[in-house]
């Protein structure tokens, strides 16, 4: 009986010693675990680099990468990317080409650097922004209504084909009449008598002669229809001369 009691006491004391010896080991292991956790949670400092590209429509695309070094010896790496937008030319309504000088120019094909309000649809008119010439620019007379060729001297000339530099109100449709702007001669110009009603030939001496075919240089009131009567202006001889 005494031996069994003694052996039980030895086992109990040995077990307590083992337990007491295990407590510091458990404490040490717990302390190491806590220390490792605290080291992994510490913030670190790092360096990074990035690059970006700018596109024509105003969007900015960038990307970057970096490496973070913590105090516990742990290395972390990562990458980041971002998008942004910017507007450089907002007010220019030019659809195809940019107009650096006049943002309100409505020219759809080519820029007009001098006159932003020019309504010329094909070519720019640098001198006269209000010119209504549809094909060619008229640098001298902005209100000229000549549709084919510019008339630099007479902006109100109504000559449809050729310009009349001297008489802006001449109604000559084919040729210009430089001397008599009111001449109604339809085919040829009458330089001396602007009121002559001779339809085919000019009558240089008698502006009121009503001779339809030939001119009557001496008697302006002769009513001879075919031949001229140089001596008797009031003779009514229709075929022969009355001397």
UniProtKB/Swiss-Prot annotation:
Which InterPro entries does this one have? VlpA-F-like_signal
Q: What residues show lipidation of type N-palmitoyl cysteine?
A: 30
In this chain, the stretch annotated as 11 X 13 AA tandem repeats covers 97-239
sequence repeat start and end residues: 97-109, 110-122, 123-135, 136-148, 149-161, 162-174, 175-187, 188-200, 201-213, 214-226, 227-239
Where does the record place it?
Cell membrane
Role: Responsible for the antigenic diversity for host adaptation. Expression in E.coli of a construct containing vlpD, vlpE, and vlpF yields antigenically distinguishable products corresponding to each gene.
Quote the record's miscellaneous comment: The numbers of repeats can vary and is one of the basis of the antigenic diversity.
Q: What is this protein called?
A: Variant surface antigen E
């Amino acid at each position: 009986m005494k031996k069994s009691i003694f052996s039980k006491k030895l086992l109990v004391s040995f077990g307590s010693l083992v337990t007491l010896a295990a407590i510091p080991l458990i404490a040490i292991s717990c302390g190491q675990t806590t220390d490792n956790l605290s080291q992994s949670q510490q913030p670190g400092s790092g360096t990074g680099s990035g690059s970006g590209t700018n596109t024509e429509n105003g969007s900015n695309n960038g990307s970057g990468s970096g490496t973070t070094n913590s105090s516990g010896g742990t290395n972390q790496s990562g990458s980041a990317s971002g998008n942004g937008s910017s507007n450089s030319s907002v007010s220019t309504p030019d659809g195809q080409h940019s107009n650096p000088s006049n943002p309100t120019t409505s020219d759809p094909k080519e820029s007009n650097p001098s006159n932003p309000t020019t309504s010329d649809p094909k070519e720019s008119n640098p001198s006269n922004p209000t010119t209504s010439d549809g094909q060619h620019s008229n640098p001298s007379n902005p209100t000229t209504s000549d549709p084919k060729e510019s008339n630099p001297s007479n902006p109100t000339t109504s000559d449809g084909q050729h310009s009349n530099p001297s008489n802006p109100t001449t109604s000559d449709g084919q040729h210009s009449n430089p001397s008599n702007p009111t001449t109604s001669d339809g085919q040829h110009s009458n330089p001396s008598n602007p009121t002559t009603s001779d339809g085919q030939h000019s009558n240089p001496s008698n502006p009121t002669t009503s001779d339809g075919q030939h001119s009557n240089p001496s008697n302006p009131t002769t009513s001879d229809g075919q031949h001229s009567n140089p001596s008797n202006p009031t003779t009514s001889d229709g075929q022969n001369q009355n001397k």
